[in-house]
Amino acid sequence: MYAIIETGGKQYKVQEGDVLKVEKLKADVDSVVKIDKVLAISSDDGFVVGKPYVDGAYVEAKVLEHAKDKKIIVFTYKSKTGYHRKLGHRQWYTKIQITKIAK
């Protein structure tokens, strides 16, 4: 059984036991979050596609940690003027483990 969920503006194909890095969620570590934006769900009964979401379907996940991702370097310059700027950015993310997929 797998599901396609939407969180943080991105879509993920998940199964029970999967560990994902998603955009930062407002939840404490070791808490359980309920994701109800399920776009599609596949099981032994068949494949169900939502319009846009499947009614009554949800995915439960356990929050494992909050951390920052690798640093991304942004370098901007303008030719012939000597102007340049170097910036770094580290995006926050949440690591979750899928515990339950319900229809």
Swiss-Prot record:
SUPFAM superfamilies: L21p-like. It holds the Pfam family Ribosomal_L21p. One of its GO terms (cellular component) is ribonucleoprotein complex. NCBIfam families: L21. Keywords: Ribonucleoprotein, Ribosomal protein, RNA-binding, rRNA-binding. GO terms for biological process: translation. Belongs to the bacterial ribosomal protein bL21 family. This is Large ribosomal subunit protein bL21. InterPro entries: bL21-like, bL21-like_sf, Ribosomal_bL21. Part of the 50S ribosomal subunit. Contacts protein L20. This protein binds to 23S rRNA in the presence of protein L20. It comes from Caldicellulosiruptor saccharolyticus (strain ATCC 43494 / DSM 8903 / Tp8T 6331). One of its GO terms (molecular function) is structural constituent of ribosome.
